Amino acid sequence: MTELPPLQDDVLPSGVRSRFVHDINGLRLHVLEAGFETCGRPLVLLLHGFPELAYSWRKVMLPLAAAGFRVVAPDQRGYGRTTGWDGEYDGDLGSFRILNAVRDALGLVSALGYREVALVAGHDFGASVAAWCALVRPDVFRSVALMSAPFAGPPVLPFDTADNPSQPKSPDNGIHDELAKLDRPRKHYQWYYSTRPANADMWRCPQGVHAFLRGYFHYKSADWKGNKPFPLKCWTGGELAKMPTYYIMDLHKNMAETVAPVMPSAADIASCQWLA
């Protein structure tokens, strides 16, 4: 795994620094920091989502630092400049369990010399990690803010089953089979991202990685005029297929092909309100 240097100052706002913290649950953890000049400040930990980085928080960090906090945003396990995880498709995925992400956060907090965190805030996938941090160690993570992804709570244990026969479980691939059998065959984007070709599809996309990601984020943002959220009635293939193709893709298209028809023009980008 290639070890990259810290981010250069010219790509960061003044007052935000990039560095590495070593030996964090087996990781060489890349972090961004603000408000580090003054010792003893309460700690705020910011956890990014997918597909994002610590860099996503750069414009949030300075206002929090100005409010008197030390603000730290790591590249989570599997992302960015952080190394020490198994990046092979056929590698061991055990280290990516959510409770191990909590250990990563705890290790970082301890390495920075803190015994508690004033606030852990998470966006998207980071919201799940933040929620579990607060659930598992409320003595450390004193408050929590969740953005974009709601937390349903810990798994519910089977109840009153000693004298009652267990109910058969639905097959895990049921929804995927439903989507694939629609008149317009579809697939869930998370299933696609778990397949072997997905990484190469995006790295080698015809648009180029930068343009593809710019189009992908535009497609998912409020700047894309087709985004008109509405509640789904139930968890069925037909109902899920009402969602945009960045969520429920056409079965035989990869994500680069999915984004290609909605790539933003220069005028679209110039008029963006949600993405700078």
Predicted feature residues:
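Conserved alpha/beta-hydrolase "nucleophile elbow" surrounding the catalytic nucleophile
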Residues: 48-50, 122-123
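Flexible "cap/lid" subdomain of the alpha/beta-hydrolase fold that forms the substrate-access gate
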Residues: 2-18, 29, 43, 79-121, ...
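Short glycine/proline-centered loop/turn elements that form peptide/ligand docking sites
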Residues: 59, 63, 150
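Core alpha-helical elements of the protein kinase catalytic domain
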Residues: 55, 62, 106-110
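Conserved alpha/beta-hydrolase
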Residues: 63-86
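A short loop-to-beta-strand scaffold at the N-terminal edge of the catalytic core in hydrolase folds
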Residues: 24-34
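Short beta-strand element of the alpha/beta-hydrolase
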Residues: 40-48
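Serine-hydrolase catalytic-loop signature spanning alpha/beta hydrolases and amidase-signature enzymes
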Residues: 51-59, 71
